[in-house]
């Protein structure tokens, strides 16, 4: 197999990268009806597999789980997840031939083996679904021409897919049809019905492509979503401890600070996040973020270049073939960092204190979001895709850090995301440690400015506000958040 993206000519590559359209609610008028009366078989019962299946069943679809015979015989966790929730569970050989839609929700590194195993068992004219297109785009999986290949990619962890559905809503979702595999022209009908079955249509769906989803997803998770949180946590903790801040306070400020600060992003973008700071703190955060952008832009661009060229995938798949030696080694190193092992503390930190004493974190978030967005859009990825894979997902990932530090983040994200996170953080951490942090003081991380006045120069503040508010990520973010708010009011009757 060869990298599918690299087999396309430049015009085709740009066309696929640029696929992104916010779909009207009316396009989902029939909701999941297209799949009713048909058999949906999910392969894999982890977080995405279980929670998508629960939602689809509650939407009136016939859902079953196909597992390897060994997983059934040994009653592994995937078997327990499905069985304890009342689903039909059986072997590939039993269920796959019955399926009208087979959804592969196993980890990326298992996709080739899974698809090569289930494809001979699939009936003529069935459909194969993915929630991440790595296998198709990066590994170049060749799929039988009679099979329709679709993607429904919720933009959040699987647990959130379920919780939002139970609230009567859903999570924003990318949907796509593989242009090489739509023999009956029903791909979009299948994808829309599947997305509606998960509740994604209530939050808003983007008509995308396998290529756009993969390239933007890889870039976001490697840089701002995971890599920047990891590198920022490590160097910020080191700085605070070196300057005499109590370890329990320093760790707590970081562990819960990312979540608190990025929650402001969710409601009002970078503008609102920066507005949570006092005027002097806002100016300081802006100045720091500009320094960070200049320092880190080459690293962000290198990751984007390696993702576009396929170099990242080649490197990671070589590690797969070597029993994940690098992945496991980097995971162990992360577990040994000082931040991961800070002592628990019952010190209370108010919401505003996370902003006041975490000015550097705000600066890192602004710099990281804008750098990731700029690198993606400069490579042909449409603004909407770049927004979802940078700013939108950041509060969700920050929430995992709040639960159990970096360990939880790396457990919840995919192995692909974890590997990319380490590649980025392994370079970003020493870069920040050596080139940026020596000039940083605890007035921006740990203690606050302690200003007695909110006064700043008017011209300076106006220039800072203009720069923040006029970034393209703010324009597209405001538009997409308004769509989601409108849909939420419709969905929950608000």
UniProtKB/Swiss-Prot annotation:
A Pfam family this chain is assigned to: KARI_C
Q: How is the cofactor bound?
A: Binds 2 magnesium ions per subunit.
Is Metal-binding there in the keyword field? yes
Ranges for domain KARI N-terminal Rossmann come to 14-208
- InterPro entries membership: 6-PGluconate_DH-like_C_sf, 6PGD_dom2, KARI, KARI_C, KARI_N, NAD(P)-bd_dom_sf
Per UniProt, residues of the KARI C-terminal knotted domain are 209-344, 345-487
Q: Which cofactor does it need?
A: Mg(2+)
Keywords annotated in UniProt: Amino-acid biosynthesis, Branched-chain amino acid biosynthesis, Magnesium, Metal-binding, NADP, Oxidoreductase, Repeat
Q: Where does NADP(+) bind?
A: 45-48, 68, 76, 78, 108-110, 158
Q: Which residues are the active-site ones?
A: 132
Q: Which reaction does it catalyse?
A: (2R)-2,3-dihydroxy-3-methylbutanoate + NADP(+) = (2S)-2-acetolactate + NADPH + H(+); (2R,3R)-2,3-dihydroxy-3-methylpentanoate + NADP(+) = (S)-2-ethyl-2-hydroxy-3-oxobutanoate + NADPH + H(+)
Q: Name one GO biological process term.
A: isoleucine biosynthetic process
Q: Where does substrate bind?
A: 414
Binding site residues for Mg(2+) 2: 217, 389, 393
Recorded GO terms, molecular function? ketol-acid reductoisomerase activity; magnesium ion binding
Pathway as given in its UniProt record? Amino-acid biosynthesis; L-isoleucine biosynthesis; L-isoleucine from 2-oxobutanoate: step 2/4; Amino-acid biosynthesis; L-valine biosynthesis; L-valine from pyruvate: step 2/4
Instruction: Write out the GO cellular component annotations.
Output: cytosol
Q: Which family does it belong to?
A: Belongs to the ketol-acid reductoisomerase family.
What PANTHER family does the entry give?
KETOL-ACID REDUCTOISOMERASE, MITOCHONDRIAL
Q: What does this protein do?
A: Involved in the biosynthesis of branched-chain amino acids (BCAA). Catalyzes an alkyl-migration followed by a ketol-acid reduction of (S)-2-acetolactate (S2AL) to yield (R)-2,3-dihydroxy-isovalerate. In the isomerase reaction, S2AL is rearranged via a Mg-dependent methyl migration to produce 3-hydroxy-3-methyl-2-ketobutyrate (HMKB). In the reductase reaction, this 2-ketoacid undergoes a metal-dependent reduction by NADPH to yield (R)-2,3-dihydroxy-isovalerate.
**HAMAP family for this protein:** IlvC (MF_00435)
Query: What name is this protein filed under?
Result: Ketol-acid reductoisomerase (NADP(+))
Tell me the organism. Answer: Aliivibrio fischeri (strain MJ11)
Q: What is the lineage of its organism?
A: Bacteria, Pseudomonadati, Pseudomonadota, Gammaproteobacteria, Vibrionales
Q: Which gene encodes it?
A: ilvC
């Amino acid at each position: 197999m060869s990298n599918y993206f690299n087999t396309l000519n430049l015009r085709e590559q740009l066309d696929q990268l640029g696929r992104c359209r916010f779909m009207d609610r009316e396009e989902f008028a029939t909701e999941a009806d297209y799949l009713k009366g048909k058999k949906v078989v999910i392969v894999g019962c982890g977080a995405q597999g279980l929670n998508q299946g629960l939602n689809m069943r509650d939407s009136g679809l016939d859902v079953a789980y196909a597992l390897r015979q060994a997983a059934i015989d040994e009653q592994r966790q995937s078997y327990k997840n499905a069985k304890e929730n009342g689903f039909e569970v059986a072997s590939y050989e039993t269920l796959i031939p019955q399926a009208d839609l087979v959804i592969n929700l196993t980890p990326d590194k298992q996709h080739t083996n899974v698809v090569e195993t289930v494809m001979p068992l699939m009936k003529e004219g069935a459909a194969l679904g993915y929630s991440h297109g790595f296998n198709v785009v990066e590994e170049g999986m060749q799929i039988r021409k009679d099979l329709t290949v679709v993607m429904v990619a919720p933009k959040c962890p699987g647990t959130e897919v379920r919780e939002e559905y139970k609230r009567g809503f859903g999570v924003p979702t990318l949907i796509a049809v593989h242009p090489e595999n739509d023999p009956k022209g029903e791909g979009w009908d299948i994808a829309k019905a599947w997305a509606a079955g998960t509740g994604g249509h209530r939050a808003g769906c983007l008509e995308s492509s396998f290529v756009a989803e993969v390239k933007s997803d890889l870039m976001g998770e490697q840089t701002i979503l995971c890599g920047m949180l990891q590198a920022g946590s490590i160097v910020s903790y080191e700085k605070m401890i070196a300057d005499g801040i109590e370890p329990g306070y320093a760790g707590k400020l970081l562990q819960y600070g990312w979540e608190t600060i990025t929650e402001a992003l969710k409601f009002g973008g970078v503008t609102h996040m920066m507005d949570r700071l006092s005027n002097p703190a806002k100016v300081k955060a802006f100045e720091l973020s500009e320094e960070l952008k200049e320092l880190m832009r080459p690293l962000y661009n290198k990751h984007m270049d390696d993702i576009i060229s396929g170099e990242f995938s080649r490197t990671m798949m070589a590690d797969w073939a070597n029993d994940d030696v690098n992945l496991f080694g980097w995971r162990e190193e992360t577990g040994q960092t000082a931040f991961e092992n800070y002592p628990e503390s019952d010190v209370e930190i108010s919401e505003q204190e996370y902003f006041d004493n975490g000015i550097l974190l705000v600066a890192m978030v602004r710099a990281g979001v804008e750098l990731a967005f700029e690198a993606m859009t400069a490579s042909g990825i449409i603004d909407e895709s770049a927004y979802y894979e940078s700013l939108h997902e950041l509060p969700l990932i920050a929430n995992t850090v709040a639960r159990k530090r970096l360990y939880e983040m790396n457990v919840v994200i995919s192995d692909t995301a974890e590997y990319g996170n380490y590649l980025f953080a392994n370079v970003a951490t020493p870069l920040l440690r050596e080139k940026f942090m020596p000039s940083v003081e605890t007035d921006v991380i740990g203690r606050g400015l302690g200003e007695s006045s909110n006064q700043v120069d008017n011209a300076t503040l106006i220039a800072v506000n203009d720069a923040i508010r006029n970034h393209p990520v703010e324009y597209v973010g405001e538009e997409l958040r308004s769509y989601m708010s409108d849909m939420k009011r419709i969905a929950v009757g608000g």
